[in-house]
From Swiss-Prot:
NCBIfam families: mutS1, PRK05399.1. GO terms for molecular function: ATP binding; ATP-dependent DNA damage sensor activity; damaged DNA binding; mismatched DNA binding. It comes from Bacillus pumilus (strain SAFR-032). InterPro entries: DNA_mismatch_repair_MutS, DNA_mismatch_repair_MutS-lik_N, DNA_mismatch_repair_MutS/MSH, DNA_mismatch_repair_MutS_C, DNA_mismatch_repair_MutS_clamp, DNA_mismatch_repair_MutS_core, DNA_mismatch_repair_MutS_N, DNA_mismatch_repair_MutS_sf. Belongs to the DNA mismatch repair MutS family. GO terms for biological process: mismatch repair. This protein is involved in the repair of mismatches in DNA. It is possible that it carries out the mismatch recognition step. This protein has a weak ATPase activity. This is DNA mismatch repair protein MutS.
């Protein structure tokens, strides 16, 4: 076994407890890393790898003052960082200075810096598996928000974690590998382990309303936070239980397909529904807006409550604009409260808190001035927190420094002892300021200066040419420079001691007073969190009102079953088009129109129309107004989509398999109150397979599910289903031919499309003319009823000499004696398995799935 120095042995002992993290080991002004940590960190951070002890121990380090930037880099890549500090004074230490890990920073526990997005929560999740389902707990350490839900299926757990963007998931070491793998891959999150779910006194207030299962799930998360953060978690709020049945369910694929919070291609906010809507003025409001989009309401009374407040704010333009200006000056109260509880709040944070509280009376008055009772009631609930404002006004200067060590935080008059020390310091400095003039007059040296530096303290500086003018015995030489000498006098030394003592006392007392002030502010955390909730709701509601007025949205109405949208518009496409004319479209469903079969050429707008209907429904159910001239909608409990064709690279599934899985998800879980969007189902396989599957799915949804369904297809043969299925109607996207080119009118009309215009689309894509002409010839032959297409390239002539073997033409097949085909063993097994199926007992979906599985075996 290798022999190490006591310091390296100390490092190894601490590292053994944090094997899944980089250990930032404090040595003087640096955080050092050793061994494998050093090798990996030097690559990830692109810093120099060195060594110690004769090259036997790899080593790298980062400066203490700039460590946060390096920590953020590692956290953004999914790593954890354990901060190990010196916890005793090196001057008084016997042997190796004592060190301890004071915090474990993980992707889910970031409290500050660039790793914390202003308008997004930073949730950490915990998942527990039970016999009858899964417990899910969520906590945002930066805001104090806590949520929990019991969820039946793992795919819904994944969808929820994806929605909130949790970067870390805490699980038990006993959770099965398959579930852990699914969570890690599907959620793309760091997995951490915690086995304690013990109830401790400080957590009782958080979990008092939870069931046993949710209590266990949240306490596992709480134990992990307590173990890693090693400080107060007093700002954590009582856990709010959310039931998936109380909000519209939108699965993971549908959230991506509809681009609710980020676009599919660039993964950016721009181009998403969130981007369109975000007119919030506070970070808190921005985060709440995202939560509302992720969880549309299904209770009509809650939807109407939001609608009513949006209507009020729309009706009072000037008051709304004043409200927006006031909200703009409110800082992030939730995260400020979190920093207070966490103990890392600085004086500028408290000044931001003070400036925010200054806006609250005006905001309350603005809302109360609105004539509607709902607005007055909301205003009456707002707590001004004026006692906290007065405390901060009395205690803090307006522009305090960033760090506590710089001092000058606490106002004069706040503490008598501090005033006394400051008077002593000021009097001493005034005396020194007068000293320069007195010494000049006394010595007759006009260039004499009184100065100060941290090494020698106060001094009197005289140029070397004038030193002979100084009175002997009165001045003591302190420092010699190239062209001057520096001296002190007994009086100067005495005053210096008084000033430095006063400043030391000021620094110590200011720190004590600030720490005490921080503890006083902690008492207000619950009130601040409630105020933050009220401000964020006002912000999200004014955001809806602002967008709705700016973009000419109308207030939707709700019905039991009817969809009646006049002049509906895709909200995001309309904004992106800006001043270009957007073609609105109607949508009528219900009363014999549960399924709309949409035909029309590529690029004509079928997918946009389908997404438009889903987004209008979501906007309506989050309480916003919608882009239409009139809208009556049912309340949808779920939205399912199958739009786009992208392989699932994470799980290695093909386009077609993803298509089938998404179709299965809709058909298994949709109800008659759901909305289903199927775009080009069946295109991932051969024509006849695809057409058969598409028809089977349409029939199954029509006969057994009853959900409102928009089904676009290129299979024009399916339009005959209108005469066979009572609730299905054909609609098409109108296009016209003009001088040999196709013009897309983007208008939805009743009936089926008369042709597909596929070759015209290829022409628009500027395929070579030879290909376009040849395709047109083939199409003409096929449309004439011919089952054979004349080859464009003639076959190469055969030679009569058998011994002269020539390369076959591309279209020629070498003739071979016909023999009875012999099946391979695996092919025979597939046929036998196919024969064993009882097709009469299978649903269309089960039959499709089995067929796909057999196809993969061949």
């Amino acid at each position: 076994m290798a022999s190490y120095t006591p310091m390296i042995q100390q490092y190894l002992n601490i590292k053994a407890e944090y094997q899944d993290a980089f250990l930032f080991f404090r040595l003087g002004d640096f955080y050092e890393m050793f061994f494998d940590d050093a090798k990996e960190a030097s690559q990830e951070l692109e810093i120099t790898l060195t060594s110690r002890d004769g090259g036997t121990i790899p080593m790298c380090g980062v400066p203490y003052h700039s460590a946060s930037a390096y920590i953020e880099q590692l956290i953004s890549k999914g790593y954890k960082v354990a901060i190990c500090e010196q916890v005793e004074d090196p001057k008084t230490a016997k042997g190796v200075v004592k060190r301890e890990v004071v915090q474990l920073i993980t992707p889910g526990t970031v409290m500050e810096g660039k790793g914390l997005s202003e308008n997004e929560n930073n949730f950490i999740a915990s998942v527990t598996k039970f016999e009858n389902g899964y417990g899910l707990a969520l906590s945002d350490l930066s805001t104090g928000e806590n949520m929990a839900a019991f969820i039946d299926r793992l795919d819904e757990v994944v969808s929820e974690i994806y929605s909130v963007g949790a970067k870390e998931i805490v699980v038990s070491k006993h959770l099965d590998e398959e579930t852990v793998k699914t969570l890690k891959e599907r959620c793309q999150a760091t997995i951490s382990y915690e086995d304690s779910d013990e109830l401790i006194d400080e957590a009782e207030r958080l979990v008092s309303r939870l069931s046993e299962q949710l209590r266990s799930t949240f306490l596992t998360l709480y134990a992990y936070l307590r173990r890693t953060q090693k400080r107060s978690l007093d700002h954590l709020q009582q856990v709010q239980v959310f039931e998936l049945e109380q909000t519209m369910k939108i699965d993971l694929y549908s959230k991506r397909n509809l681009e609710l919070t980020e676009t599919i291609r660039s993964k950016s906010k721009k181009g998403s529904l969130l981007w369109l809507l975000d007119e919030t003025k506070t970070a808190m409001g921005g985060r709440l807006l995202k939560q509302w989009i992720d969880r549309p309401l299904i209770r009509l009374s809650h939807i109407k409550e939001r609608q009513e407040m949006v209507q009020i704010l729309m009706d009072h333009f000037f008051e709304r604009e004043d409200l927006r200006e006031r909200l703009k000056q409110v800082y992030d109260l939730e995260r400020l409260a979190g920093r207070v509880a966490f103990g890392n709040v600085n004086a500028r944070d408290l000044i931001q808190l003070k400036e925010s509280l200054k806006q609250v009376p005006a905001i309350k008055e603005l809302v109360h001035s609105l004539p509607e009772e709902m607005a007055k009631s909301r205003a009456n609930d707002i707590d001004l927190c004026d006692d906290l404002l007065n405390l901060l006004e009395d205690a803090l200067y307006e522009n305090p420094p960033m760090t506590l060590k710089e001092g000058n935080l606490i106002k004069d008059g706040y503490n008598a002892k501090l005033d006394e020390y400051r008077d002593a310091s000021r009097n001493g400095k005034d005396w020194i300021a007068r000293l320069e003039q007195q010494e000049r007059e006394y010595t007759g040296i006009r260039s004499l200066k009184v100065g100060f530096n941290k090494v020698f303290g106060y001094y009197i500086e005289v140029t070397r040419a004038n030193t002979h003018l100084l009175e002997e015995g009165r001045y003591e030489r302190k420092q010699t420079l190239a062209n001057a000498e520096r001296y002190i006098t007994p009086e100067l030394k005495e005053k210096e001691a008084l000033i430095l003592e006063a400043e030391s006392n000021i620094s110590e007392l200011e720190y004590e007073l600030f720490a005490a002030l921080r503890e006083q502010v902690k008492v207000y955390i619950p009130r601040l969190q409630l105020l933050a909730k009220q401000m964020s709701e006002l912000d999200a509601l004014q955001c809806f009102a602002t967008v709705s007025e700016k973009r000419r949205y109308i207030r939707p109405e709700f019905s039991e079953d009817e969809v009646d949208v006049i002049d509906g518009r895709h909200p995001v496409v309309e904004k992106v088009m800006d001043h270009q004319e957007y073609v609105p479209n109607d949508c009528h469903m219900g009363n014999g129109r549960q399924t709309l079969l949409i035909t029309g050429p590529n690029m004509s707008g079928k997918s946009t129309y389908m997404r438009q209907m889903a987004l209008i429904s979501i906007l309506a159910q989050i309480g916003c107004f919608v882009p239409a001239s009139k809208a009556t909608l049912p309340i949808f409990d779920q939205i399912f989509t199958r739009i786009g064709a992208a392989d699932d690279l994470i799980s290695g599934q093909s386009t077609f398999m993803v298509e089938m899985l998404e179709a299965k998800n809709a058909m298994v879980h949709a109800t008659k109150n759901s909305l289903i969007l199927f775009d080009e189902i069946g295109r991932g396989t051969s024509t006849y397979d695809g057409m058969a599957l598409a028809q089977a799915i349409i029939e199954f949804v029509h006969d057994h599910v009853g959900a409102k369904t928009l089904f676009s297809t290129h299979y024009h043969e399916l339009t005959v289903l209108e005469s066979q299925l009572s609730e299905l109607k054909n609609v098409h996207v109108r296009a016209e031919e003009h001088e040999g080119t196709v013009v897309f009118l983007h208008q939805i009309k009743e009936g089926a499309a008369d042709k597909s215009y596929g070759i015209h689309v290829a022409q628009l894509a500027e395929l070579p003319d030879a290909i376009i002409d040849r395709a047109q010839t083939i199409l003409t032959e096929l449309e004439s009823g011919s089952h054979e297409v004349t080859p464009h390239v003639s076959a190469a002539p055969k030679t009569e000499k058998a011994e002269e073997k020539q390369q076959l033409s591309f279209f020629e097949v070498e003739e071979k004696p016909q023999t009875k085909p012999v099946l391979k063993q695996k092919d025979q097994a597939v046929i036998e398995e196919l024969k064993s199926f009882n097709l009469m007992d299978m649903t269309p979906l089960e039959a499709m799935t089995k067929l796909y599985e057999l196809q993969k075996k061949l």
